[in-house]
Structure formats: structure tokens, C-alpha cells
Amino acid sequence: MILFPAIDLKNGQCVRLEQGDMARATVFNLDPAAQAKSFADQGFEYLHVVDLDGAFAGKPMNAQAVEAMLKIVKMPVQLGGGIRDLKTVEAWLGKGITRVIIGTAAVRDPELVKMAAKAFPGRVAVGLDARDGKVAVEGWAETSEVTALDIAKRFEDAGVAAIIFTDIARDGLLKGLNLDATIALGDAISIPVIASGGLASIEDVKAMLTPRARKLEGAIAGRALYDGRLDPAEALALIRAISG
């Protein structure tokens, strides 16, 4: 299991939102690169970054902050937000991003995902953010009529590296992961699934390490790390002890 620390970027700063609402943003660090280094120093091995402004604009908006992080940390970085065409995918991978996350475009333009996954094997993930079971797009500003499972199944044979499944209702609220829905998705498809939204404490990490969650690739931790509710050393030691 991989525990991904999250850095969400808004106006070049490291923030956390509540339920994806840009008006409910809390700034946690003015220097995202310093935050990335802190996570690396704490022992994390894979960083999760989202360009929030990019998700709304439909194009990269925090490139300077992302590039500054890439210069400082050597661990793999997966990036989402504003990645809507093959040119942007290629540009980010060329700059050192390990894995890009395609969200809105996976709903609007599934062929883009298939082309990108074929062109860059193992380096394209799909972000599915659900509200009441239906996938939200455009930075969560709009809700579609399709379910996460419907979309995930489109990419079963496309070579997608992972599905990142976020429960919007829990995101940033420390209510605990929606493991039931995440595990159900993971059990229904062959693509590895990453849990996101609501991770609140070491209890969520323990739940991720139980046999029923064995198919999940990992979980994303955000506010719990920034608020000090989740101790990085304790969480990483537990993961190493149980999953190796």
C-alpha cells in the first residue's frame, strides 16, 4: 500500500479545500516546494499534486509551483488538474512528472485517455470524483449523469495505470475514507484503485491494510497530515510492518 501525501495548489500556494469548494480553502503553506520537501523528509515515497486552478481553467495554472517541487524532491510525483489534451500530458511527463491524472477529460473525451495511456504506458491515471455516486467534472463544479464504475469500465483494456476515486462529500472534512464504495469499485475492475477523500486518522490506514482492501493500491492523505491528526512516522511504520 502507498500512502500519498497531497499538495493542492491554488494561486501558487498549498491549500486544502472542503468538499472541493474553492471558497472554502485553507492555506497551509505559502511555499509548495518546501511542503514537498517536508513530505520527502518525513519518509513518504510518492507525492500527489493537484492544480486546483487548472482544474477550473481547463489548462495548467500552477506550472511554476509544480516545477519548483520537481527540482527539490526526487520521489515520484503524480499530477492532476487542467490536463485536457495530449500535448499537456506529454509536456508534464517531459518535465519530470511520473504519472498524470486525467479527470474531466476522461468523462468528456475518453479517447484522450486511451491515446495517452497507449503513448505513455504506466504513466496515465484517471481521476474519478463522485458526488452521490455520480462523477463530477470541471473542478467538481458540474455533476454528470454517469457513475464512477461506468467510466472506469471504459478504460479496462486501455492500459490505465490507476483509478483515483474521490468521495467529494468527505473530501477535506476528516470523516474517514468511503472504503465501502472504493473497495466495491476496486473489486469490479482490474485497474488498481487509490482511495481519496476524508482520510482522518491512523484508523483509516489500518482499514486500508485489512484483507478486504488488499486490491487497493493506496490512499491519499491531505488535511489529516496538515492538521496533525495523522502522524507520518506511525502511519508509514504500520504500512511497512503489514504490507512490506
From Swiss-Prot:
Keyword GTP-binding assigned: no
Record EC number: 5.3.1.16
Highest rank taxon of the organism: Bacteria
Presence of the UniProt keyword GTP-binding in the record: no
Alphabetized Pfam families for the sequence: His_biosynth (PF00977)
Active site: D8, D129
GO MF terms, alphabetically ordered: 1-(5-phosphoribosyl)-5-[(5-phosphoribosylamino)methylideneamino]imidazole-4-carboxamide isomerase activity
Catalytic activity: 1-(5-phospho-beta-D-ribosyl)-5-[(5-phospho-beta-D-ribosylamino)methylideneamino]imidazole-4-carboxamide = 5-[(5-phospho-1-deoxy-D-ribulos-1-ylimino)methylamino]-1-(5-phospho-beta-D-ribosyl)imidazole-4-carboxamide
Entry keywords, A to Z: Amino-acid biosynthesis, Cytoplasm, Histidine biosynthesis, Isomerase
Pathway the protein takes part in: Amino-acid biosynthesis; L-histidine biosynthesis; L-histidine from 5-phospho-alpha-D-ribose 1-diphosphate: step 4/9
Any one GO cellular component localisation term in the record: cytoplasm
Ranges in coiled-coil conformation: none
Broad class of the protein's primary localization: cytoplasm
UniProt-annotated location(s): Cytoplasm
GO biological process, one term: L-histidine biosynthetic process
CDD domains attached to this UniProt entry: HisA (cd04732)
InterPro entries: Aldolase_TIM, His_biosynth, HisA_bact_arch, Isoase_HisA-like, Isoase_HisA-like_bact, RibuloseP-bd_barrel
HAMAP family linked: HisA (MF_01014)
UniProt record similarity statement: Belongs to the HisA/HisF family.
Protein name as catalogued: 1-(5-phosphoribosyl)-5-[(5-phosphoribosylamino)methylideneamino] imidazole-4-carboxamide isomerase
Organism: Bradyrhizobium sp. (strain ORS 278)
